[in-house]
Each structure stands twice: as C-alpha cells, then as structure tokens.
C-alpha cells in the first residue's frame, strides 16, 4: 500500500482557501551553524480550514460543524464520508444519518431474521447486529440538533466509539479508530430555526473540535464563492467520487497517537497552564473556579476581558485532544509541503486549543453580552491573551526543563540588556562587578495575571528527575 498523499485528501466539492491558522515552523532538513545550532529561519505556514479537518481526521478526533444555512458544512462532511471513507454504500466505510426525530439507530446497526422453518418468533434471538456496519470507521450525523433530547442520547455512545447490543458494549471502527462527525445550526443569539433542539452539553463535550463556519476566517473567500457558483447550477449537496483511504488513514493515525503518547515538556507545561492555571480563582473560598464560574467573576478585580475571567480550566477530555491535534497539524504540514517541517510546539498547541476548548469553558455571560454569542470570536481573543502568557512561559521553559527554579535576572552590560537564569555564580559575579540587576519569577508573573501556580514546582521537580 502506497503512503497517503495530500492530493488524495483534497476535497472534490467543498471549496475553502481561506487561511484558518498560521504556524511558525522550520522547513527542510536541519542546517547547523558553526556552533552546532539549527540555522534554519522560522517561516510562517498557512493552513486552511480543510487542512485542519484533514489533520483532525488523521488524529481520529470527533468534529462538530456549526453555522447558519448555506455555509457548506453538509457538503464538507459529505466529501469526508465519500472521498475519504468510500461512502455509505455496501462497500463503503461510512455510516450516515440525518438528525430527525424519526431516526432509529437500531435501523442502522441491527437486522431482524425470522426462522420460517420453526414457525416461532423470538425477538431476542431474531435481532442480529450488522457487523459490517459496526466495523465502519466513520459516522456522520447531518443537522444533529433536529433530533430531540432522547434521540441525541443515542449518539453519546457513537461519539465514544461504542454501540450497545443485547447489553454488550461493542467497539465501533477498527484498531481503536472511530470518527464521529456532525453538523448543526448553533450559536444563534435569537434562533430562527424551527424544529431544532438545544444540544446536550455531554454531546457537545464529545465533539473534540468545534468549527464555527460563520467565523470570517473559516468561511470561503469571495474567490472561492465565485468558483462554487461557476461550478454548479443547483444548491444541492454533491456526492464526491467514492474513494476509500481508510487503510492509509489508520496507518498515519497510529503514528500520530504513538508520538502523542510521548512525554513532551512543552506540552506538559501548556496543559498545566490551561488546566490548573486557568482553573484558579483568587475570589473563590477554595481557590478554584469549578461551579463558581462565571458568577464570582462579577465580584473580582480581574473582571472584564482579562484572561482568567474569560475562560476556565480545560477538562481532562479536551486536554489530550489538544496534544493529538498539535501533532497531527505537524504531520499534515509535512504532507502538504512534501518536506520536513518542525512547527514551534507552543504555536501548535495554542492553535489546537482554539478548536478543542470551546463548549462549556468560555464565560457564557461575556459571550452573550460582549460578543453577541460569537463564541469563536471570543475564543480567538482568549487565545490571543493566552499567547501573551505562553510567551512569558517561553522565557522560563528552558531552565524549567533543565530542572532549575524559574527565576530570571536582567541587567545592562556594554549597552545591551541581558537576561539570564538566576544562579549563585551569576549573582556573585554581578555583585562583585557592582552591576545592579532585576529579578522576575514565573510564579509571580502568573499570579499577577490571576492564574494558578501550584503546578510550577512539581513540574520543575519532575523535569529534574528526568534529567
């Protein structure tokens, strides 16, 4: 089997060349300078929304596409189902359902066989599971919010890659890979979609990534819209030519998951920052946001558009998705460019964070009042503020990874401002030379931004043990 190519992934019908994310990266083989350091310059990589979807597919991450009508979300999901998984016909690897009240999941996964010879009918023994359907790798639900609450509950297990038959939990897909994808009309301050229902929070949490196709950066460009207009005369969804890439997708998925399981000091620091750091609340009696978020924000000095009042700590469900998507973006970038790519690790996790920490984490009061329910816009501003904190963390990370206390001293020397890790030898030398210096400490800087720091010392201790 040949390796997967970027051209094979390209959607045949869905068109969107808009830049969704930008990542700093070093491209090509390493070029060492005289000191043995990598001399490759940092370049900015631009990836489209389609690229992010490809990466999420390779990572095996569930996706939810939300927008007003006519943004192409059903066309996008249809292209994935038919062009990557061979469609839902007999030989395909995709399951497809419409989120309507009459939908019955048993129709998809079960059949009834009657023993005509015996003349008896036993409903339990007559029910059989459709093994070929259970083993399919893709499950798509169009307009999932047209299904009422009880029907939405049927999708919980599917999003977890499970199906229950006769009391037994069956694994969907193959080798642990089962991709769930859905479309919905959400994020409307004053909804005008009749026959729709609010999505259950538990179901939203099972969507590892959420894409708001109404967002300016995620919708097709005017040039794309002209291409679409010239290409088709009717507004119906086009079925892509059936193509089955499942074998190649599974191979890459294993590589990505293997890489994501490795301890990465950069990601570990980031996960603590967006987990324990963002979950800290100075106003709360127990010093954590929890159920108090966002109500206590109204009485806090950080209230407004400060980072800690905009978002709470990430859940244990979303944190692994951030790491896996970050690795998948690196793999997709190499696939697209056809050469080695080393993406800045903190850039990668920041961009992954934009899509994976969406529902239930943002301050809903601020989202409604200040952003008119434009959650992705609020998320982008949150990530912009978080990137400032990450850049602060970036200065301290080398010494933390080396197992050193995250304290930096800065001083003037020969007309230049010098920054260096604080150690006894450097301090003695500066005092002897009568050179004044200033100290900055990571924990102090994070506290000033209203973020938790109880993770810093354990992180440094663990890095020191791993040296």
What are these regions (language model features)?
Residues 146-151, 161-256:
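Canonical AAA+ ATPase core
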Residues 54, 58-101:
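Walker A/P-loop
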Residues 70-75, 297-467:
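C-terminal engagement/docking regions of AAA+ P-loop ATPases
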Residues 52-55, 112-139:
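Conserved alpha-helical scaffold flanking the Walker A/P-loop in AAA+ ATPase domains
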Residues 65, 140-141:
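Hydrophobic anchor at the beta1->P-loop junction of P-loop NTPases
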Residues 44-45, 232-330, 334-337:
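Conserved AAA+ ATPase small/helical "lid" subdomain
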Residues 2-69:
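Pre-Walker A (pre-P-loop) alpha-helix and adjacent loop at the N terminus of AAA/AAA+ ATPase modules
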Residues 142-144, 154:
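Walker B catalytic acidic pair
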């Amino acid at each position: 089997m040949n390796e997967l190519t970027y051209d094979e992934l390209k959607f045949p019908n869905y068109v969107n060349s808009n830049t969704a994310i930008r990542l700093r990266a070093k491209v090509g083989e390493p070029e060492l300078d005289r000191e043995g350091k990598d001399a490759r310059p940092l370049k900015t990589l631009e990836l489209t929304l389609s690229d992010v979807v490809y990466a999420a597919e390779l990572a095996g991450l569930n996706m939810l596409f939300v927008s007003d009508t006519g943004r192409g979300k059903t066309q996008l999901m249809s292209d994935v189902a038919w062009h990557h998984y061979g469609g839902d016909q007999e030989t395909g690897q995709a399951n497809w359902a419409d989120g309507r009240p009459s939908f019955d999941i048993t129709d998809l996964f079960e059949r009834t066989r009657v023993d005509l010879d015996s003349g008896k009918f036993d409903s339990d023994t007559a029910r059989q599971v459709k093994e070929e359907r259970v083993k399919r790798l893709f499950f798509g639900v169009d307009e999932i919010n047209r299904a009422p609450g009880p029907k939405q509950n049927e999708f919980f297990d599917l999003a977890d890659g499970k199906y229950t038959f006769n009391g037994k939990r069956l694994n969907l897909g193959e080798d642990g890979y089962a991709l769930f994808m859905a479309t919905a009309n959400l994020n409307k301050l004053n909804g005008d979609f009749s026959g729709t229902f609010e999505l259950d929070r538990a179901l939203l949490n099972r969507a590892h990534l959420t894409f708001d196709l109404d967002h300016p950066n995620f919708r097709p460009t005017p040039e794309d819209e002209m291409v679409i207009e010239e290409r088709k005369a009717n507004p119906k969804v086009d079925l892509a030519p059936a193509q089955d890439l499942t074998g190649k997708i599974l191979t890459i998925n294993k590589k990505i998951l293997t890489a994501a399981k490795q301890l990465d000091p950069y990601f570990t620091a980031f996960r603590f920052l967006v987990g324990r750091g963002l979950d800290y609340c100075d106003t709360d009696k127990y010093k954590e946001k929890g159920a108090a978020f966002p109500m206590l924000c109204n009485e806090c000095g950080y209230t407004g558009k400060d980072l800690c009042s905009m978002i709470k700590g990430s859940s244990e469900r979303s944190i692994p998705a951030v790491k896996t998507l970050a690795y998948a973006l690196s793999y997709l970038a190499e696939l697209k460019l056809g050469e080695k790519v080393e993406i800045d690790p903190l850039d990668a996790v920041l961009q992954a964070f934009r899509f994976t920490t969406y529902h239930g984490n943002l301050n809903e009061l601020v989202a409604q009042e200040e952003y008119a329910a434009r959650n992705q816009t609020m998320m982008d501003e949150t990530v912009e503020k978080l990137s400032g904190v990450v850049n602060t963390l970036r200065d301290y990370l080398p010494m933390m990874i080396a197992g050193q206390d995250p304290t930096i001293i800065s001083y003037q020397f020969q007309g230049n401002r010098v920054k260096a890790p604080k150690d006894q030898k450097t301090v003695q030398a500066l005092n002897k030379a009568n050179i004044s210096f200033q100290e900055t400490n990571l924990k102090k800087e994070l506290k000033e931004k209203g973020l938790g720091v109880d993770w810093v010392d354990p992180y440094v201790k663990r890095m020191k043990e791993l040296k």
